[in-house]
Amino acid sequence: MISIELVPFPISDFIRQQSGNVLSEREASMMDFCHKLGQVYAGFIDDNFVCCWGLIPGSFVSNQAYLWMWSQGPITHQFTFIRRSQIQVQEMLKRYPTIIGHCKRSSRSAQRWLKWLGAEFEPATGDILSFTIRRVS
């Protein structure tokens, strides 16, 4: 069974409850700051925490948002994860016609996942790839 929950603030406490003390203080601070700027969701498969993600709008009137995602390790149930991700991104694109973000160039699995979601990549800057996902009219 798949479920998605809106996560109460702060996200770092939620992750500690689900996965133990896996975040550094810097990571916890960054994620809590992202959480202050937008809503955060958590995905579960068979009641097991899989990942969390959120959107950070550029402003109150912005038509684009920054997508971030965190998981403790490799995602299992990949087909289910990709399909649910596609559904979630389509919902996000109803609110924000453009979604932007970054991933590591060395993370081939993240790039494949983002391509399944419709991401277009810009040339790499060091180990960072910028991506854009646009609403199709």
Feature annotation, model-predicted:
Residues 96-115, 120, 125-127:
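Conserved beta-strand-loop-alpha-helix junction that forms the acyl-donor binding cleft
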Residues 37-55:
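Conserved beta-hairpin
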Residues 32-36:
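Short loop/turn motifs at secondary-structure junctions and domain boundaries
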Residues 77-91, 112, 116:
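Conserved acetyl-CoA-binding loop-helix of GNAT-fold acetyltransferases
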Residues 127-137:
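C-terminal "cap" of GNAT-fold acetyltransferases
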Residues 1-28:
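Short amphipathic alpha-helix that is part of the acyltransferase structural core
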Residues 62-76, 129:
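Conserved acetyl-CoA binding element of GNAT-fold acetyltransferases
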Residues 53-62, 121-122:
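A conserved beta-strand-loop-helix scaffold within acyl/acetyltransferase catalytic domains
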